Amino acid sequence: MRIIAGTARGTVIDAPLGRDTRPTLDRVRENVFNILQQQVRGARVLDLFSGSGAMAFEAVSRGAASAVLVDVDKKAHQVEEANCRKLRMDDRCRLLLMDWQAAVSQLQRADDCFNLVF
């Protein structure tokens, strides 16, 4: 799996092992971002059930201002952390290890708003 376009183009990222996570295929991600291209630059992204973080990292690579990645699976969270460091996106990505409902409640209380949600 790799980042398709933007500042991190071509960088290979890892996916959690096992059957608990099914990463979004490169070609699917490419098509989604081709459709959303005008909305990505400067956007604030929320990636629920983020797995490897591929959707959020792709968005940030293509110019999104920031991303919040949420996953309840500890293995997935560890892979996201490693991918985030590898991509040097620590300053633009926040990773939350928690249930999506708890994360959404926490983000609402903090008045966080998002332009794109995956």
Go through each PLM region and give its residues.
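Class I S-adenosyl-L-methionine-dependent methyltransferase catalytic core
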Residues: 1-118
